[in-house]
Amino acid sequence: MAMSRLKPSGRIGDNMKKTLGLVALFVLIVLSCFYFFPKQPKNILDEIYQETEKTYLGNNVFNKLKDVEVHKYQEYSDDSKFYPTVAYEGNALPDSYEKIAIDFNFKSEAQLSLISFEKRIESNVNIKMWTVYSHKERNLKKFIKIVLKKADTKNYIEDEDQVKSYLEKYGITAKDLDSYYDEIVNQKVLKDWCSIYDSKYSPSNYGDVKVETQWENW
């Protein structure tokens, strides 16, 4: 007597398809998290770096500000890529401050952005302060040097002992340096950023970033 072959149940086949579909969806979600999560800005400087990188070849995000000039400089020596600079116009600068600028280097392995400005101490002496932010390392370093101006030339003093000597001569303390930094970087540059971008952070809450200050223990 011939035995009839058993046929797989249609319900079992449908369940298998649903299970495989759910597994595939789960794997896709996990892979998406691994891809997108590291790209999310972890601090306010990440936001600035990433948004500028996205927009600088077209309509740079900083074009939303009225008191800045946005430039693209091309490096012909190696890769012919453009690198952006944002410079504040003279009429937008607070009294006794000069040359507020934001620069980016997307080619650098450390993925750098810099904020710089000068504080006028007297007619021929400035303090130059600047930050270097590494998008890759998520650390912000703050530096200082003295600028001596004579006619059309400038002499930069970076040796810490000499810098301290000039600061002492003009009665400038580490707290004063902190106040200069706060007035320009926090109250001007980062405040402007929050006015043109829906930031998750603020000038008083940078987010996840390690900050190192050259003059911290002076």
Residue ranges and their predicted role:
Residues T19-Y35:
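Hydrophobic membrane-insertion alpha-helices, especially the h-region
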Residues A2, M16-T19:
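Positively charged n-region of N-terminal signal peptides that target proteins for export
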Residues G13-D14, L112:
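Juxtamembrane/transmembrane-helix boundary motifs in multi-pass membrane proteins
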Residues L31-I121:
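N-terminal export/targeting and maturation segments
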Residues I12, G21, F26, N105-F106:
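Intrinsically disordered, low-complexity segments of exported/surface proteins
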Residues T85-W218:
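Extracytoplasmic electrostatic interaction patches
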